[in-house]
Amino acid sequence: DFMLLAMDQLVNHLDKLPLFGWTPKVIIRCRVGQKTPLDAGPQHTQNYARAFMTMLHTVRVDEVCTASEVTAYERALLWPDSTIIVENPIG
């Protein structure tokens, strides 16, 4: 949930920089907290991946729910623009 604190920089800076002719290559990895075996509480188990996908137009957002989706990291590395990878172990 600390990604919400970075929303100004993500939406108003990182997402807009390509419109001004500069395309930084940034890869951000964040994780959604699990509810089992220990509940991290409502503040750390919320998933904002869909909100990021809606608000960010030049930044790719990938949601990874299983270990088999490790290709998301390769895509982020090969993708020319910035990427946010949201690890959501509870799907």
Residue spans of the language-model regions?
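Conserved thiamine diphosphate
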Residues: 1-91
